[in-house]
Amino acid sequence: MTIVELFDEKPINNIVGILAFNPDKVIYVGGYTRKHFESKKLPILKKYLDRKGYSALDIEYVQVRRDSFKDIMEKFENIYSSDSGCVFHVEVTGGEDLILIGLGALSQRRPDIELYQISSKLRTIRSFSLSADDGRKLDIECRNTVEENLLLHGASIISANGDETFPGGYRFDADFVHDINVMWDICGRGSKNMVSPSAPNSWNKVTIMLASLNAEDPDRENQNLLCIDAQRFKEEYMTSINGTLFYDYICYFIRCDLLDCRIESEHVYINFKNDQVRMCLTKAGLILELKTYLICKKLMDSRDGDCLTSVTIDWDGDENLASTIKYLYNLDDPDSTIDTTNEIDILATCGLIPYFISCKNGKFTSEELYKLYLVGEQFGKGYCQKIIVTTDLNHALGDAKNVILQRAVDIGIQIIEDVHKKTDDEIADELKKVMELPKIKTCV
């Protein structure tokens, strides 16, 4: 089978026909020069297709003049004639206006041409032609993993799921999931296990204090054991402005088996349960990120999707295929290239739709909105969903809350508020709603 794809600025539009119909050959039609296509677009496309198992696919590119309807028609006629004997399939989701008009004119002349279009949510593919009375819906599903979506957009994953800190990444065994739920409950309800509007803020204060202690001796032999001078611990932590708060939380952490604290005459010893718990108790926003990830991953798994957390993205990929210019740290060292990177709290895909989720357990500014918007549009052009999951916005943002919320809405970012007051099912329902997830298919 030969298919024709109208080459588009949105990379997802360029691979729908390939994923749907598994052709032997694809012909891209577009306004880019052949040189630009082969040097800038094709390497990224081939790397993606190789990963998807299409390394043997025959790829051809036909350049048309964007301003010449005659040239467009001639090129389409040539493609049709040269592939006579083959079914002529054209995927029309992408493409420029005049090229689409040309294709319409060709379809009028050649009513046997089958056209395909995927819906705006990338879930439904319909086939139609002038020789048929009506179009038909095809039972075809296309999917990308998180990594495949980034490859398609010229990027790569530097690290994910905590593998920059832990060999093999986070260990989401039953014990760690239990600890996440315990810590999340403390973050949302406070050390007294009671609902409090300022509980997330209290959590942030205590974890920042623990982070300060954790950073004092980074080369210590036992990373989970902190040794602090007793007098200094008393003056700086126990009798400081947040001393009572810190003491209450440490006592509660002990009761929940998250850490142990031993006070001696000369030193105070804080021993974390394990390295993953230590990370959660010394990085203020991590517990919200991991809790949201577990809920989101469950939603994705039930829909054959993909979900990663703590994803660091290299914008132009391992081989710099997406770069146009590379600047150097050291002008005398050609290998000292500068890579643009971003970390996204949670990246997910369902079908072909990518989701970019940022988790905020405290104060943030409109700059964070623009960062999320930029990264989402860069690696999900036209189709990405951008979401911010938050705890106590009233306390964190104060009078600026509605200004930031309005700005988020204006640039297409969904915000889920006050998740610390909600059950897992309520959070999942809100995620399903803003992500516009399809219903789970059930076997009859």
Where are these regions (language model features)?
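Short glycine-centered, acidic/aromatic-flanked micro-motifs in structured strand/loop junctions
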Residues: G30, V92, C359
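C-terminal structured interaction module
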Residues: V92, L98-I101
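Short beta->alpha connector loops
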Residues: F7-I12, G95-D97, K363-F364
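Intrinsically disordered, low-complexity segments enriched in Gly and acidic/Ser/Thr residues
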Residues: N361-L369
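Long, low-complexity, Lys/Arg-enriched
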Residues: M1-V87, I101-T341, I353, Y370, ...
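Conserved catalytic cores of phosphodiester-cleaving nucleases, focusing on short active-site segments
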Residues: C296, I346-A348, I353-N361
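Short glycine-rich phosphate-binding loop at a beta-alpha junction
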Residues: V87-T93
